[in-house]
Amino acid sequence: MAASFFSDFGLMWYLEELKKEEFRKFKEHLKQMTLQLELKQIPWTEVKKASREELANLLIKHYEEQQAWNITLRIFQKMDRKDLCMKVMRERTGYTKTYQAHAKQKFSRLWSSKSVTEIHLYFEEEVKQEECDHLDRLFAPKEAGKQPRTVIIQGPQGIGKTTLLMKLMMAWSDNKIFRDRFLYTFYFCCRELRELPPTSLADLISREWPDPAAPITEIVSQPERLLFVIDSFEELQGGLNEPDSDLCGDLMEKRPVQVLLSSLLRKKMLPEASLLIAIKPVCPKELRDQVTISEIYQPRGFNESDRLVYFCCFFKDPKRAMEAFNLVRESEQLFSICQIPLLCWILCTSLKQEMQKGKDLALTCQSTTSVYSSFVFNLFTPEGAEGPTPQTQHQLKALCSLAAEGMWTDTFEFCEDDLRRNGVVDADIPALLGTKILLKYGERESSYVFLHVCIQEFCAALFYLLKSHLDHPHPAVRCVQELLVANFEKARRAHWIFLGCFLTGLLNKKEQEKLDAFFGFQLSQEIKQQIHQCLKSLGERGNPQGQVDSLAIFYCLFEMQDPAFVKQAVNLLQEANFHIIDNVDLVVSAYCLKYCSSLRKLCFSVQNVFKKEDEHSSTSDYSLICWHHICSVLTTSGHLRELQVQDSTLSESTFVTWCNQLRHPSCRLQKLGINNVSFSGQSVLLFEVLFYQPDLKYLSFTLTKLSRDDIRSLCDALNYPAGNVKELALVNCHLSPIDCEVLAGLLTNNKKLTYLNVSCNQLDTGVPLLCEALCSPDTVLVYLMLAFCHLSEQCCEYISEMLLRNKSVRYLDLSANVLKDEGLKTLCEALKHPDCCLDSLCLVKCFITAAGCEDLASALISNQNLKILQIGCNEIGDVGVQLLCRALTHTDCRLEILGLEECGLTSTCCKDLASVLTCSKTLQQLNLTLNTLDHTGVVVLCEALRHPECALQVLGLRKTDFDEETQALLTAEEERNPNLTITDDCDTITRVEI
C-alpha cells in the first residue's frame, strides 16, 4: 500500500466527502469514540472550530497515522457511510492482494506436494460451488452486533478436514469465498506450532507473510474482518486449560503457543476476529465449555460417486475397478469405510495386492479385519516371496507392541525411545517407513505416527494374538478382558474405534489361517474364552445406568462371522441398549439380535435410516429384512419383558413390521415405552396391539404426537376387556382440552388403570372433565400426574372437589403450573378435610410464596394421610419454612418426605428445621439442595442430626457447594450415622411406598 494513503492529505480528501451536517456529526462521534477507546483527547474547542484540513492535521498530530485512519473508518461505519468505507477498503487492499498471491502460491505448492496416498491427484484442488456457498453461509453474520463466528470442523482422521482447509485458503486467495467478509485469512497448524518457542501472535502472522516485515497494525486494524484457521487442534497439548489470568491480550507479547491460541479462542485477544477450528470427532470438554461455538460442520468425505471415481482412477483397468467396487458395494460396512478417503486408499491398496496375487477378492471383502490383515501382512511380505522373513516378522511384532502401548496410554505420536522399548531398532526404521505403515511426523526428525489410527488399532489387536499382556514392556498395557470392558463401556476410551472389532475379527477361522501362515502360531482359543467370560460378567452385572454400549458388543461379534459363538455370546446378555444411525448399524444389530433368546429388556433408537416412503422411494428389501430380524427378538426372546423405542423415525413398511411382531402371540411384553417416535401409516395398528397383549401392564408415549383420533383409538383399545394395562403415560404428546373428554371416559370405564401421567400437555380447560370422571366412586386411579399442563388457580376448585369425593387417588403431581397462593389455598381446604385420602402432593414450581405456607401448614396438621410433600422451586423463603416447621413439629403431622430445594432459603431457617429434626418421629427425607446455606446453618443441622430422637435418613445437600470445613463436617456426620445419607440426588433414594 502506498505510504501517501495514510497522510493527512488522504484523510482530508475523505473528510471533504462529508456534507456540512455530516461533518458536524463526525466531530460529535469523534468526541464519543475517543472517550470510549480511552484515547488522549483533542481539545474540544479545537475540534469544534476545525476545518476539514485542520481536523485531518489534528488527527494525525494526536494519533499515529494508522490509528487516525482506524478511528475515521469506525466513525464512517457508525454514520452508515458504507461508500466511504468501501473506498478505504479498496485503497487498502494492496496488502490484501499481496498476501492473497502469496497464500495461493503456498497452498497450491502444498496441494501438489507428494503425499503417501496421493488421493489428491484424483480430485480437483478447487472448491466446488456448493462447498463455497456452504462455507460462506457458515461465516455469514447471524445477528447485528454478533459478527465474530467460531466454527468447528469436526470429523475422523482422514475424512478430509485439512484438505478442505487447504482448498478454502486457495479459494479465498482467488476471491471465490468470503469476498466481502474477510480481508485476511491466516492458517495455523497446531502440529507445527507446538514445536515453536514462546512467540507472539504478531510473529505467527509474520511467519505467514511473504515479506520479513508484516504490516501488523494494518492487518489487525479491522479485527472483525480477520479469520484464523486453526488445523489439528487436538495436537495442542494442554490447550484451553489456562486460568483467565494467564491469557494474553497483547499482540506483541511472547507467550507459549497454547496460551496464544487459547487467548484467541477465548476472545481475550482480538475478540472481534472469527475462527475456524478443525478437530477430531471427540470434541474436548474444555473446548465446549470455554469457547462459544457458532456452528459445527462435519465433512462428508467421499460420496458414492466420489468413491466410484476413486476406484476407477486407482485401479486404472476399468474391469478390475468395477469388480472391486461392486464387491465393496455389497458390504455396507466396507462401503461406509470408503467414505473416509484415507481408509478408501487402504482398502483399494489391499484389494490390489490380492488381485496381483490372484487371490479371491470376495474372501478379502468378508470383513473389515480381513481387509486390514491383508493390507498389513502384504506390506511385511517381501515382493515375490511366499511369506515373511524372520526380520519382517520381528518388525511387525515390534510394531504391534508399540501400537498396544499407544492405545493404552492414549499415545499416537512416538519418539525413538518408544520404538526401542518395544523392539524397533534403529536399523528397522527405514524399512518401516518404506512400508508407509509408519510415518515421520511433524517438524521433528525423531517423531513417528501410524499411517492412520485404525492401522494402530489393528496392530494393537494383533499384539494380543501374539503375546500375553504380561510380556509387554509397558505396565499400562492391560489384559484382553479389560480391553473389552473398556471398549464396551460408553464413557471409557471413546477414541477406540475398531480395536475391539479387530480383536474379535482376528478370531475368524480365515484370519486364524492367515496368522498361522504368517507367524506360525496364534492365541485365538484363549481369547475366545476371555470374551465369553467378559460378556458373562456384563450380563450378570446388568446395565442399570446404560453404561454398556450394546452396539459396540454387536460390532465385535459381527466381525467374528462365527454364528455358533455369536449365538452363545448374545445369550449371555439380559439387556441391550443401542442407537442405530446408519445402515451399517442396522445390519450389525440385525445380525446379532436374530440370535438373541435371553434378553429381558431392549432399548433402541433408529435415525437417518428409514426415509418417508412414496411412489418414488421405498425402504429397500435388504433393510426390511434387517429390520425384521431386529423386531423378531420380540417373539424369539421368551424372557423379553420391556421394550423402549426412542428418538426414532419409522417408514410405513417398517412400522407395520414392528406392529406385526408386537401383536404376535409369542410376544410377552409387560412394559412398552415409545419416546419421541414418528411413524407413517395407520397408528391404529399400534393401539390394536393391546388386543393381543394381555401381559402388557405399562404403556408410555413421550414426545410422540398423537391426534384426536389416535387418543380415541388408544382409549378404545385400553377399554378392551382382555387388556390389563395399569399404567399409562402420555407425556408431551400434543394433547388438547378436547382430548380430556375421551380420557375422562377411560377413567370412568376402565377398572384396571391405576396410573395416569398426562404431563406437558396443554389441558387447562379439559381438567374439569378429568376431575368430574374421578369423582365417580367406581374409579380406581391411584397416581395422577398433571405437571406443566398450563393449569391456573381456577382449576384448583375442580381438583379440590375431586380430592374430597375420590377415595382412590393417593399421588397428585401439579408441578410447573401457575397455581399461586390462591390456588394453593383452595387445594388446602380439601386437604384439611377428613375425607381427603391423598398421600403425596407435588407442587414444584407453582409460584407459591411464604403467604401460601400458612394454608399448607394448617393442612399438614389436619391431614394425617399426607406422607410426601414436594414444594421445591417456590420462593417461600425462610418465613415460609418457619410456618411449615411449626406444623412439622406438631404431633398430628405424619409427613415422611419434604422437598424444599431451591426455595430461597438461608441459614436463618436452620434453627426451625433443626427443631423439626429433633421433634418429628416420621420425617425421613429432607431436600435442601440449591439453597444458600452457610457453615453456621449446617452446624445447626448437624447438631440436630445427632439428637437421639432424629429419624431422618436422607438429607439433600450438595457437599461441593460448601467450603472444605463444611464438607468435612457433613462427611463426618455421614460416617458417624450409618443410617444417614447426604446427597444432592434425592430422586435416586427409595421413596416411601404409598
Swiss-Prot record:
Q: Which GO terms describe its molecular function?
A: ATP binding; molecular adaptor activity
Q: Which UniProt keywords apply?
A: ATP-binding, Inflammatory response, Leucine-rich repeat, Nucleotide-binding, Repeat
- Any one GO biological process: regulation of inflammatory response
Q: Which residues form the NACHT domain?
A: 149-472
Which Gene Ontology CC terms are recorded? cytoplasm; cytosol
- Which residues hold ATP? 155-162
Per-repeat ranges for LRR: 637-660, 698-721, 722-745, 750-777, 806-833, 863-886, 920-943, 949-972
Q: Output the Pfam families linked to this UniProt entry.
A: LRR_6, NACHT, NLRC4_HD2, NOD2_WH, PYRIN
Occurrences of domain Pyrin (ranges): 1-94
Q: What does this protein do?
A: May be involved in inflammation and recognition of cytosolic pathogen-associated molecular patterns (PAMPs) not intercepted by membrane-bound receptors. Acts as a negative regulator of the type I interferon signaling pathway by serving as an adapter to promote DTX4-mediated ubiquitination of activated TBK1, and its subsequent degradation. Suppresses NF-kappaB induction by the cytokines TNFA and IL1B, suggesting that it operates at a point of convergence in these two cytokine signaling pathways.
Relate the assembly described in the record: Interacts with CHUK/IKKA, inhibiting its kinase activity.
In which family does this protein belong, per the annotation? Belongs to the NLRP family.
Domain remark in the UniProt entry? The pyrin domain is sufficient for suppression of NF-kappaB activity, it adopts a typical death domain fold, but in contrast to several NLRP family pyrin domains it doesn't bind homotypically to the ASC adapter, which supports the observation that NLRP4 has no effect on IL1B activation.
**Protein name per its UniProtKB record:** NACHT, LRR and PYD domains-containing protein 4
Q: Which organism is it from?
A: Homo sapiens
